[in-house]
């Protein structure tokens, strides 16, 4: 049990005038400290702003000076090399001349996951950079690659084995370091490290190949645009459903593909819809023809019922005759032999027609084709005339008139005169 007298004394001490004054003094000290800190921060900010303003005022001059120095340095570095080696020099750095008394050892490192055309072209450039090259390829382990770059499709052993089957590769170094060090170069007697000139950024540095470039042992290769492992993976992810259906069709199970039961049924439903669409598109013409035939059959049945058999037979007969006329005319015009028989206007035919008395106008193919329509009209009219031939012959038969005899005499006289003129 606590003594009540001691508790009261402590409370009195806290509430005494001296303690209250001390509390106010503490608050004053805090305020003074905060004010001084704010002033110091403002002074620092002003000084920084002044320095930045000075820098911004000097940047155009600095830029001109730096660009001029950089251009002079680039010109000096390029003039040190022969023309055939200038393309291998990295921008802003020197390039060492290759040794002549031994094979040149070039090192190219990379993940080489899903070995593709871009990898092959880069290794080919390394191998063909000099006449006598030994190409060494380094492959980092799965542990380092997954930590620094991300998950891979193939394991490090599979990637190393893939590179051994490439014709340009002479040696494969497994468990290669992520950043090449001078000790690693000495260990494997490497003359050049090959990669494209784009800075390769990591967590520690802006360019992991910068120390190698400063040593003059960096060989620049050209990157193949549009081809990379990331591009291949993005294509697969973009068409994920299509590749799933492809693997299901080849016998893969949903457990192997890590697909849920709902996703599999969804894909099968989409597959059936696509199959129905393709079937409908293929058979659309057949369906149209069948519907057209059905329409004509129904139409004929309705015409028979409404018109009767006699009118329907007459209607069908006229339509068939018209179709036959068109077909015969087309066959006549398409036949080359009959087209040769058509007489066309010429001076010889006109001269002969003057003595024969025939019509001098030439017959066109359409005129000859119209003969079929005339013949068909005669056939149609023959049936009607035959029925009334007996009665019409008795009533309409009249002897030839005198005008007809006069016309015949004139034509004979004209012919005899023309023959005499031709003989003279």
Curated annotation (Swiss-Prot):
One of its GO terms (cellular component) is membrane. Keywords: Lipid biosynthesis, Lipid metabolism, Membrane, Nucleotidyltransferase, Phospholipid biosynthesis, Phospholipid metabolism, Phosphoprotein, Transferase. The modification Phosphoserine is found at residues 16, 346, 401. Residues 45-55 have a biased composition (Basic and acidic residues). Its main location: membrane. Residues 35-44 have a biased composition (Acidic residues). CTP binds at residues 111-119, 149, 195-196, 200, 223-227. Belongs to the cytidylyltransferase family. It comes from Saccharomyces cerevisiae (strain ATCC 204508 / S288c). Catalyzes the key rate-limiting step in the CDP-choline pathway for phosphatidylcholine biosynthesis. Pathway: Phospholipid metabolism; phosphatidylcholine biosynthesis; phosphatidylcholine from phosphocholine: step 1/2. GO terms for biological process: CDP-choline pathway; phosphatidylcholine biosynthetic process. Its EC number is 2.7.7.15. The keyword Nucleus does not apply. This is Choline-phosphate cytidylyltransferase. It is found in: Membrane. Residues 14-24, 381-398 have a biased composition (Low complexity). Residues 1-70, 348-424 are annotated as: Disordered. It comes from the Eukaryota. Disulfide bonds: none annotated. It catalyses: phosphocholine + CTP + H(+) = CDP-choline + diphosphate. Pfam families: CTP_transf_like. GO terms for molecular function: choline-phosphate cytidylyltransferase activity; phosphatidylcholine binding. InterPro entries: CCT, Cyt_trans-like, Pcy1-like, Rossmann-like_a/b/a_fold. Present with 3050 molecules/cell in log phase SD medium. Substrate binds at residues 149, 178.
């Amino acid at each position: 049990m606590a003594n009540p007298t001691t508790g009261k004394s402590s409370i009195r001490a806290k509430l005494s005038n001296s303690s209250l004054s001390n509390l106010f003094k503490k608050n004053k000290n805090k305020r003074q400290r905060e004010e001084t800190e704010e002033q110091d921060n403002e002074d620092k900010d002003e000084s920084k702003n002044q320095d930045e303003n000075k820098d911004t005022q000097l940047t155009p001059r600095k830029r001109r000076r730096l660009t001029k120095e950089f251009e002079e340095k680039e010109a000096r570095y390029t003039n040190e090399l022969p023309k055939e080696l200038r393309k291998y020099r990295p921008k802003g750095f020197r390039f060492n001349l290759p040794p002549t008394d031994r094979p040149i050892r070039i090192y190219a490192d990379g993940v080489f996951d899903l070995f593709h055309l871009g990898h092959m072209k880069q290794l080919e450039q390394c191998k063909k950079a000099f006449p006598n090259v030994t190409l060494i390829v380094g492959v980092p382990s799965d542990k380092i690659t997954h930590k620094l770059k991300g998950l891979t499709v193939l394991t490090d052993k599979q990637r190393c084995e893939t590179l051994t089957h490439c014709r340009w590769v002479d040696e494969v170094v497994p468990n290669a370091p992520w950043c090449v060090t001078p000790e690693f170069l000495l260990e494997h007697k490497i003359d050049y490290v090959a990669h494209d000139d784009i800075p390769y950024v990591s967590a520690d540095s802006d360019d992991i190949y910068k120390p190698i470039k400063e040593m003059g042992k960096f060989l620049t290769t050209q990157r193949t645009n549009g081809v990379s492992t990331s591009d291949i993976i993005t294509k697969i992810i973009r068409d994920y459903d299509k590749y799933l259906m492809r693997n299901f069709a080849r016998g893969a199970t949903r457990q192997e593909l890590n697909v849920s039961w709902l996703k599999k049924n969804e894909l099968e439903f989409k597959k059936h819809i696509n199959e129905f669409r393709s079937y409908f598109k293929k058979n659309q013409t057949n369906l149209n023809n069948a519907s057209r035939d059905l329409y004509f059959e129904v139409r004929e049945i309705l015409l028979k019922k409404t018109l009767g058999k006699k009118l329907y037979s007459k209607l069908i007969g006229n339509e068939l005759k018209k179709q036959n006329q068109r077909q015969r005319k087309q066959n006549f015009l398409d036949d080359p032999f009959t087209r040769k028989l058509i007489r066309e206007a010429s001076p010889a035919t006109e001269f002969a027609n003057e003595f024969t008395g025939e019509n001098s106008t030439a017959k066109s193919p359409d005129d000859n084709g119209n003969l079929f329509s005339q013949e068909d009209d005669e056939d149609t009219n023959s049936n009607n005339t035959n029925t009334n031939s007996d009665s019409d012959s008795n009533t309409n038969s009249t002897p030839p008139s005198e005008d007809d005899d006069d016309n015949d005499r004139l034509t004979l006289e004209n012919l005899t005169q023309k023959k005499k003129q031709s003989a003279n």
